[in-house]
């Protein structure tokens, strides 16, 4: 006898969206998750709430001309699909861009979404028109950040009589009868009162079995499992980093992807991952090895561990994967930003809802305080307390402080000074051969960047802009770009291309759709949207198939 119509494995954003779609169509759902109720929303709760919209009213009000055609050009140029198994990821890419240019915004707003009026410009590229990057700003921030986005869906099912949450239930096996998935088996973990994101006990106190007509895997990726990240590290990126910090909680362990694969599901593109190169150690950690990502403006001077400037166009915020590959091939696991107080005040944001309390709490008064002189309070807290930050009034003292940090290659002051001096000479007038200075000036053509995000070019060593600041940047794990292969209804496929009856996948476990809708790279603002779009498809697909 079935325990519910559908079992959803994972209480993150994709799972919540899928459950909402099922409940709206009259189906009963069990949501199984290995963590406690405090972790509903998963990684999405911790996020900045960035969403990729195309030709939105917010864009148009800021003078941004966007279109479905331009967005698809950017997506395909960024994804770089080049494998036979990219058939469904490519289909998902076309469908997702259509969604982002079509009903995505209105569909979310009908459910309560509000967005911040300024649009961010992430992954700017710096190559040609058919290459990687966003041609225009498309990063829309949820008013209320990740928690507000999660709540849009959580509140729709929290008290529903059709939904049962089975927390602290860890799935260990898919039940397969006559080639069809018919449920899940697993272990009941001991109760936990651990706060959200804190690693919880894995002590088993019992077992369970749930049966249903369909199972949706929405369990997330591998970003919290550093062993699995290293195992899947592709040779094309160079050596596997020795030093990694974690951008997601420990429960993001990738177990369900392997469990589904063992049952017969096809996993593709597991060598494609999205890890950030601007990670800093959290001075107030929540989970093990907790790192935070800097969302940088384009003005910081970026040096490798040996003091050499990163090549064109590896500027802050331009090409995450290209920068990651360059770092890994440099022989070291970290890099440096050199900047000053003027730059950090305007150009440093920190990813995550807890690092943006004004946006998260939707406090307009606190938000307006960002226009005051000085860095935002969360950023200043890292300057004051972060182990990766150095401040000094002279470049010589700054380099000495950088060399005092643990686990660094000693920098030669003359080499660093030569890079800084050469860069500073290029801002003396409105002409330059320096690509980064040209990029900064181009960014300031966008009203949102000019007033809130990008400082006017000036000398790093200008005493009026000081003190000087250096930041040691680590590689920060985050997203799994490959995963369970699915069709456009989120049905999981077998290796021979046929559907695996009764099994669906959504969110990061499915590579955000199809087993890798992003290809090799992301345009940003696409992960939450990918969870929403694929979760919606999974809920609708399962509902249609069991009707």
From Swiss-Prot:
Origin superkingdom: Bacteria
Gene3D superfamilies: FAD/NAD(P)-binding domain, Succinate dehydrogenase/fumarate reductase flavoprotein, catalytic domain
Coiled-coil intervals, chain numbering: none
One example of a Gene Ontology biological process annotation: lipid catabolic process
Annotated FAD binding sites: 5-36
UniProt-recorded Gene Ontology molecular function terms: steroid dehydrogenase activity, acting on the CH-CH group of donors
Pathway it works in: Lipid metabolism; steroid biosynthesis
Purpose of the protein: The low activity could be due to different substrate specificity.
UniProt record similarity statement: Belongs to the FAD-dependent oxidoreductase 2 family.
Protein name: KsdD-like steroid dehydrogenase MSMEG_5835
Lineage of origin: Bacteria, Bacillati, Actinomycetota, Actinomycetes, Mycobacteriales
């Amino acid at each position: 006898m079935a325990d519910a119509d559908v079992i959803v494995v994972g209480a993150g954003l994709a799972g919540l969206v899928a459950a909402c779609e099922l409940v709206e169509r009259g189906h009963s759902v069990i949501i199984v998750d290995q963590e406690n109720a405090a972790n509903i929303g998963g990684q999405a709760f911790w996020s900045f709430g960035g969403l990729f919209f195309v030709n939105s009213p917010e864009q148009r009000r800021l003078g941004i001309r966007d279109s479905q055609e331009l967005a698809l050009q950017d997506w395909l140029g960024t994804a770089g699909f080049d494998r036979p198994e990219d058939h469904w990821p490519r289909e998902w890419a076309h469908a997702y861009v259509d969604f982002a240019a079509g009903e995505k915004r209105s569909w979310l707003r009908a459910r309560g979404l509000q967005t911040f009026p300024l649009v961010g410009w992430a992954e700017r590229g710096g190559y040609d028109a058919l290459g990687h990057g966003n041609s225009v700003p498309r990063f829309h921030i949820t008013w209320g950040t990740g928690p507000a986005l999660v709540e849009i869906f959580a509140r729709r099912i929290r008290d529903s009589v059709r939904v049962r949450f089975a927390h602290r239930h860890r799935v260990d096996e898919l039940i397969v009868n006559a080639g069809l998935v018919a449920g899940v088996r697993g272990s009941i973990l001991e109760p936990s009162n651990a706060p959200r994101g804190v690693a919880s006990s894995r002590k088993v106190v019992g077992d369970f079995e749930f049966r249903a007509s369909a199972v949706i895997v929405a369990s997330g990726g591998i970003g919290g499992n550093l062993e699995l990240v290293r195992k899947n590290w592709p040779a094309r990126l160079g050596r596997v980093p020795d030093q990694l910090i974690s951008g997601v909680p420990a429960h993001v362990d990738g177990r369900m992807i392997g469990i589904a694969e063992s049952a017969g599901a096809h996993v593709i593109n597991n060598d494609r991952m999205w890890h950030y190169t601007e990670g800093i150690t959290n001075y107030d950690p929540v989970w093990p090895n907790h790192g935070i990502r800097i969302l940088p403006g384009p003005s910081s001077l970026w040096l490798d561990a040996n003091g050499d400037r990163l090549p064109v166009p590896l500027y802050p915020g331009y090409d995450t994967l290209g920068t990651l590959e360059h770092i890994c091939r440099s022989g070291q696991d970290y890099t440096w930003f050199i900047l000053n107080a003027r730059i950090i005040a305007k150009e440093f944001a920190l990813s995550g809802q807890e690092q943006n309390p004004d946006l998260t709490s939707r406090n307009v008064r606190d938000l307006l305080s960002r226009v005051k002189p000085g860095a935002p309070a969360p950023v200043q807290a890292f300057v004051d307390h972060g182990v990766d930050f150095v401040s000094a009034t002279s470049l010589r003292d700054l380099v000495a402080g950088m060399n005092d940090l643990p686990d660094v290659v000693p920098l030669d002051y003359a080499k660093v000074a030569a890079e800084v001096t050469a860069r500073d000479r290029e801002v003396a007038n409105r002409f330059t051969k320096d690509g980064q200075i040209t990029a900064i000036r181009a960014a300031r053509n966008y009203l949102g960047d000019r007033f809130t995000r990008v400082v006017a070019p000036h000398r790093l060593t200008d005493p009026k802009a000081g003190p000087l600041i250096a930041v040691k940047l680590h590689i920060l794990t985050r997203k799994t770009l490959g995963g369970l292969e699915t069709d456009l209804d989120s049905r999981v496929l077998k290796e021979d291309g046929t559907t695996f009856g009764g099994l669906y996948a959504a969110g990061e476990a499915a590579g955000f759709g199809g087993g890798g809708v992003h290809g090799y790279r992301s345009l940003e603002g696409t992960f939450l949207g990918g969870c929403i779009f694929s979760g919606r498809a999974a809920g609708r697909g399962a509902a249609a198939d069991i009707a």
